[in-house]
Amino acid sequence: MNANTDILSLRVHAALDALRRGLPVIVADDADRENEADLILAADTLTVPEMARMIRDGSGIVCLCLTPERAERLQLPPMAAENGSRYGTAFTVAIEAAQGVTTGVSAADRTTTIRAAIHPDAKPGDLVRPGHVYPIVARAGGVRERRGHTEASVELARLAGFSPAGVLCELMNPDGTMMRGQQVQDYAERHDLPQLSVAELAEWLQREPA
């Protein structure tokens, strides 16, 4: 094991430790792809304060990343019959919890919706459509098949010992531009959050399949 391997392993395990403690991880994708950093949480540990953080510090578009099996079980059809998005992000129709919410917009309501969707006994009727939470279906092959935030969030949740479902939101600057580079670094240091890239996770999984 060389020094680079040690550093990579430390970064991955720091991210998993944060997720186990209910804290978000900052995950960046490739500079020649979206070149954005997302706050990612394991859906099982989501709390109202962490949802509020995502809404406050992110784009406001909070997504629930699911396996194909869970999306099929909940009968979540694609948002569009033909996916024309640049990177093939597999959005389904937006959702809301059928019970326990008001307008569905608040941090508490969105947390309730996500908890309803990931409950072990969740059924299609537990959700209404459309809503204010945006499910995305991860590829079955994870980051080995598609190097996206969606797949990374599901992989990280699974590796941390939770159900394979993640919550994410893109980090945004107060002026409405996307956080990148040093801005992301400053945010991570200010909030003491670990950082990881999708590429690093894919490399680690290739060497240490889990």
From Swiss-Prot:
CC annotations in GO: cytosol
Write out the catalysed reaction. Answer: D-ribulose 5-phosphate = (2S)-2-hydroxy-3-oxobutyl phosphate + formate + H(+)
Transmembrane segments in this chain: where?
A: none
Co-factor(s) = Mg(2+); Mn(2+)
Protein's recorded name = 3,4-dihydroxy-2-butanone 4-phosphate synthase
Query: Which InterPro entries does this chain map to?
Result: DHBP_synth_RibB-like_a/b_dom, DHBP_synthase_RibB
Xref: NCBIfam families: ribB
